[in-house]
Amino acid sequence: MTQLSRFLYGGDYNPDQWPEETWSKDIHVFKKADINSATINIFSWALLEPREGKYNFSKLDKVVQQLSDANFDIVMGTATAAMPAWMFKKYPDIARVDYQDRRHVFGQRHNFCPNSSNYQRLAGELVKQLVERYKDNKHIVVWHINNEYGGNCYCENCQNAFRKWLKNKYKTVEGLNKAWNMNVWSHTIYDWDEIVVPNELGDVWGIEGSETIVAGLSIDYLRFQSESMQNLFKMEKKIIKKYDPETPVTTNFHGLPNKMVDYQKWAKGQDIISYDSYPTYDAPAYKAAFLYDLMRSLKHQPFMLMESAPSQVNWQPYSPLKRPGQMEATEFQAVAHGADTVQFFQLKQAVGGSEKFHSAVIAHSQRTDTRVFKELADLGKKLKNAGPTILGSKTKAKVAIVFDWSNFWSYEYVDGITQDLNYVDSILDYYRQFYERNIPTDIIGVDDDFSNYDLVVAPVLYMVKHGLDKKINDYVENGGNFVTTYMSGMVNSSDNVYLGGYPGPLKEVTGIWVEESDAVVPGQKIKVLMNGKDYDTGLICNLIHPNDAKILATYASEFYAGTPAVTENQYGKGRAWYIGTRLEHQGLTQLFNHIIFETGVESLVCDSHKLEITKRVTEDGKELYFVLNMSNEERTLPSKFTGYEDILTGEKAHKDMKGWDVQVLRN
């Protein structure tokens, strides 16, 4: 990470939506809340370039000057995320064609074709103008490329580029036919121009990314689209670095996470990871924690919380107000898991457009005596006090959960067994086990180094690409501990099944093979017997044959009662567990009590009293414990922290933690 010079507190500011005479007053209000940064120019292309090649930076010049004079740090957008109307009129090929084969017209955003040479040229020219103009302004601390990349395109530009991409990957049509198993349903091709993009008029149906005839085609197209958008990012970054090689460059990741963009592939090109976080009102706290751990783990460095909501959002089906104290707790949750910034959308609430009811620092009332503003000012004061200590500190984890976009795509393309396969939910089942025990956890990809961890958990590792099995075997053989589950080791990187019984190349390390998989229908409960107690399970039940593995749990109902449900296998110096069914939370907790004991993985605090507790370590080795009450019920601080200092207030830690209370403690 290119180190930020201070902890950023601020967010998206759109002064181009407001009269110039209001800007200085806005900045004065921001300063009252100890806000020190603003993200600008995200969607200003139409103002900057009203006609092709005719640029007008007069308004942006004034905005930059006023923010610089106020000593604000500026996150400068490149404005390429939403195109002006004239571009659609002059260059129709710029507009993306969606999954239903409809070419978009002017409107919304995420509306460009990533393989349009006209878009690439015009975006590049705008970025060049922008960077040449502002490259020497030292108040610009981050360049923010585009915004929340997404929106796959299925146009002729993309189809032609996809054919070239496939030719480069497979070399011959014979190689492609073999990889995609194209003898199914007379799909064999004899020329590259016979390949068509997988939209609803062809081999796919249902929600985008959910149903396909030829999984190899559909997965490769998602890889291609993610790479195409990444190439746009790389193009803009190259231009920025030519004129400003020092200032860090990012683009904001988003979603739960965004399924269509492989952030692990993108991470190497980011100087710093940034993320937009908008948990729904009913999302459990561990879900947001997982996403923050994923963002931190992409580069194993602190990240930017680029966007979040002071209170309500405008686009979710239901958006209750954040309760008193809840905003501070949710912002500090991001910091606890690795964020070095707290930034909002938006700093000033719009009067029009679809986001006019999205909460802001300056609300429509334009008052500073409101509940939300007072809470924002209190948060600003605490970040001003604690930010210098927190900035740059890191998380050290000995547990890793494997999350992989190719598995995300292929797992949810599975046609058969059950329609209820959900990759993220399956991962969260296992993340929750460590979250509730306050065990620091990294979220890693299949290409990351496993040897850094005492325990690696790879739920639903459906796709095992070439070489991954050897990597897992070597890790376990050398003393590592590995957990995998049902729907693992089933297919190769083209989504073709491994023969010889499941879990395919993972049979050796797990010491089992799976004969069949039963779907558990809605409303049905299957019992699993473990340590003399029955536990409910669902979704899928693997019928397991142990080879070398010992049995930890058996099914207690259905015709496969008495057969293994969970196994443990000694392999070299390490062990591998196989969980053949989706145990409900109580049963999974019982199982992980055993696994965690056996592996020696330690919790930060044993008597957590239902508090979320994480730890960051500063460069000089000081430990910072983030203690968060992510509920509206009163909790008790663990006795371990008696006498610690709360760096948010400078006072001693307090024992009774009211709802949404936060303490950041050091000894």
Swiss-Prot record:
The active site is at E148, E307. It catalyses: Hydrolysis of terminal non-reducing beta-D-galactose residues in beta-D-galactosides. Transmembrane segments: none annotated. SUPFAM superfamilies: (Trans)glycosidases (SSF51445), Class I glutamine amidotransferase-like (SSF52317). Keywords: Glycosidase, Hydrolase, Metal-binding, Zinc. GO terms for cellular component: beta-galactosidase complex. One of its GO terms (molecular function) is beta-galactosidase activity. It holds the Pfam family Glyco_hydro_42M. Has potential for lactose removal from dairy products at refrigerated temperatures. InterPro entries: Beta_galactosidase_C, Beta_galactosidase_Trimer, Class_I_gatase-like, Glyco_hydro_42, Glyco_hydro_42_N, Glyco_hydro_b, Glycoside_hydrolase_SF. Its EC number is 3.2.1.23. One of its GO terms (biological process) is galactose metabolic process. Substrate binds at R109, N147, W315, E355, K356, F357, H358. Optimum temperature is 37 degrees Celsius for both lactose and ONPG hydrolysis. Retains 16.5% of activity for ONPG hydrolysis and 11.2% of activity for lactose hydrolysis at 4 degrees Celsius. Stable at or below 25 degrees Celsius, but loses 50% of its activity after 1 hour at 37 degrees Celsius and is inactivated after only 40 minutes at 45 degrees Celsius. Can hydrolyze 73% of lactose in milk in 30 hours at 10 degrees Celsius. Catalyzes the hydrolysis of lactose to its constituent monosaccharides glucose and galactose. PANTHER family: BETA-GALACTOSIDASE GANA. Belongs to the glycosyl hydrolase 42 family. This is Beta-galactosidase LacZ. The lineage of its organism: Bacteria, Bacillati, Bacillota, Bacilli, Lactobacillales.
